[in-house]
Amino acid sequence: MEQRTEEWFAARLGKVTASCVADVMAKTRSGHAASRQNYMAELICQRLTGMQETRFSNAAMQRGTDLEPHARARYIIETGEIVTETGLVDHPTIAGFGASPDGLVGDTGLIEIKCPNTWTHLETIKTGKPKREYLLQMQTQMACTGRQWCDFVSYDDRLPDDMQYFCTRIERDDALIAEIESEVSAFLSELEAEIEYLKRKAA
């Protein structure tokens, strides 16, 4: 299943996906963050309408999508790894939960590619690690695929050649995966209860 096709969007409909796990787990001092409730509302609407509203996109986001194949090619050159593209992979035990890695690497790995604005890319080089939302995304991908590591790639072709490409390997963290799975399971239970409540009120 090719990503960003009608089939792929249909497979994701109403499901918690890896790229939004940070929203599910977002908290403030007083409890859950607004982004969690907003994401739940979005999924409830998807499940009840069978449709997905078009998500906001801008030139920077489109540029990131367009650059992804170039970043993947650079990774293959740098590492010599074989990358197989894939579609949505459902979680093996949690229904309504899945991930779409940017590629399967060999027998045990994954790749996650980001093509951000230049300063974000440079910040990643400086800190040597991805943002927490990306760590959650990659651990979710490993939970869904059973893979053991994920190479995180940040790429910006506007910079000098020796600064365009950054790669670091993120190992599977079973403790964090257990936390993610617990949070997502609770979120999905709340979502399903809310749908049932809405159906009763409408009857």
Summary of predicted features, one role per range:
Residues S30-G31, H70-R74, V153-R158:
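Intrinsically disordered, low-complexity boundary segments flanking structured domains
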Residues T79-P101, V105-L188, E192-E194:
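Nucleic-acid nuclease catalytic cores
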